[in-house]
């Protein structure tokens, strides 16, 4: 029986692509383990999947000054020792890393044990963890073809993003019943990220009188961002977040308005949903969402509205453009085969 160790954490985006791959390896009878941090979100997610989880010390890698930067390098070194010992006991054939600060000690620990390390980078440019880890990796899978120019060419393999199977199995009829929507009007699903997005939420609600004339709206507004005055608004359903219902909601969705996190937009791409992307500004991020969104716009998958340009009028204008050019977007979206990502990654894992 072949063995694999997965790692990645710090945010759900560094975990969910692993969950897309794991079921296929289970079918092939791989022995699967996961190494993450003591209290990260990856621990909560992975333990629900009935996968052996081993925690290690980890220090956060920051690009800015913080007093914790003095202590955290020592935590990283302890994490490397923890990971080295754990990997020596597990004796995996390969390590697959999805990035995030906890992955660095695991990658180095694997390299010290002479275990092949495969990385996956979701964004156009590598995050700090993967920048450090890539020198210890034998291969790095990229979601965007353009990412190759930022990485050692001899290690890069373009795959796209692995998408969880359950996302593709939504039920339109269940969504209609859950939302109380009509079949007669198209549906727009609006997602501002797990914490929501204040400017997007406010602008969407101001635009409702105009939008609801033609569309039904599902608004995932983030924790603490519900507007009680709109709870009974016909054609408008708001949620802090949804879990099991999301595939059904996406099945009934005609257009998506969203941030431009890589994992989410590749789910929309695989589902062939035209998108209006409002990426996080450079003031709130390292600019990766802007690059992601602009790549999708160039390929005809999405329209981009920059956060500083968001107004009621600009939002309505971009929604109308999505609707008017729906067929052109659909034609472009059909060119992408999302299933190839998992197949390619599984092939290289098996060959490692």
From Swiss-Prot:
GO terms for cellular component: plasma membrane. Pathway: Cell wall biogenesis; peptidoglycan biosynthesis. It is found in: Cell membrane. It is a peripheral membrane protein. Its main location: membrane. Keywords: Cell cycle, Cell division, Cell membrane, Cell shape, Cell wall biogenesis/degradation, Glycosyltransferase, Membrane, Peptidoglycan synthesis, Transferase. The keyword Membrane applies. It catalyses: di-trans,octa-cis-undecaprenyl diphospho-N-acetyl-alpha-D-muramoyl-L-alanyl-D-glutamyl-meso-2,6-diaminopimeloyl-D-alanyl-D-alanine + UDP-N-acetyl-alpha-D-glucosamine = di-trans,octa-cis-undecaprenyl diphospho-[N-acetyl-alpha-D-glucosaminyl-(1->4)]-N-acetyl-alpha-D-muramoyl-L-alanyl-D-glutamyl-meso-2,6-diaminopimeloyl-D-alanyl-D-alanine + UDP + H(+). Its EC number is 2.4.1.227. InterPro entries: GlcNAc_MurG, Glyco_trans_28_C, GlycoTrans_28_N. The keyword Methyltransferase does not apply. SUPFAM superfamilies: UDP-Glycosyltransferase/glycogen phosphorylase. Cell wall formation. Catalyzes the transfer of a GlcNAc subunit on undecaprenyl-pyrophosphoryl-MurNAc-pentapeptide (lipid intermediate I) to form undecaprenyl-pyrophosphoryl-MurNAc-(pentapeptide)GlcNAc (lipid intermediate II). Belongs to the glycosyltransferase 28 family. MurG subfamily. This is UDP-N-acetylglucosamine--N-acetylmuramyl-(pentapeptide) pyrophosphoryl-undecaprenol N-acetylglucosamine transferase 2. It comes from Bacillus anthracis. The gene is murG2.
């Amino acid at each position: 029986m072949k063995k694999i160790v997965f790692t990645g954490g710090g945010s759900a985006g560094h975990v969910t692509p692993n969950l897309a791959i794991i079921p296929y390896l289970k079918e092939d009878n791989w022995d699967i383990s996961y190494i993450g941090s003591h209290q990260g979100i990856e621990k909560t997610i992975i333990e629900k999947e009935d996968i052996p989880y081993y925690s290690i010390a980890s220090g956060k890698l920051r690009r800015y000054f913080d007093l914790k930067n003095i202590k955290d390098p020592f935590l990283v070194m302890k994490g490397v020792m923890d990971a080295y010992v754990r990997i020596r006991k597990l004796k995996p054939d390969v390590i697959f890393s999805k990035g995030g600060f906890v992955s660095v000690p695991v990658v180095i620990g694997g390299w010290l044990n002479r275990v092949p390390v495969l990385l996956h980078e979701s964004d156009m440019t590598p995050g700090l963890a993967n920048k450090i880890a890539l020198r210890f990796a034998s291969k790095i899978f990229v979601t965007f073809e353009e990412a190759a120019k930022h990485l050692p060419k001899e290690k890069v393999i373009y795959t796209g993003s692995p998408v969880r199977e359950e996302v593709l199995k939504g039920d339109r009829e269940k969504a209609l019943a859950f939302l109380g929507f009509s079949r007669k009007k198209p549906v727009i699903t609006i997602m501002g990220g797990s914490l929501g997005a204040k400017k997007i939420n406010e602008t969407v609600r101001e635009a409702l009188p105009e939008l609801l004339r033609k569309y039904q709206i599902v608004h995932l507004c983030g924790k603490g961002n519900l507007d009680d005055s709109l709870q009974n608004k016909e054609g408008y359903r708001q949620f802090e977040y949804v879990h099991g219902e999301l595939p059904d909601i996406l099945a009934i969705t005609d257009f998506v308005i969203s941030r431009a996190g890589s994992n989410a937009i590749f789910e929309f791409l695989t589902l062939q949903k035209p998108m209006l992307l409002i990426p996080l500004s450079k003031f709130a991020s390292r600019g990766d969402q802007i690059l992601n969104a602009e790549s999708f716009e160039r390929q005809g998958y999405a329209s981009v509205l920059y956060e500083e340009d968001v107004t009621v009028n600009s939002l309505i204008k971009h929604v109308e453009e999505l609707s008017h050019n729906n067929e052109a977007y659909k034609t472009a979206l059909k060119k992408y085969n999302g299933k190839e990502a998992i197949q390619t990654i599984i092939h290289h894992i098996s060959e490692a």
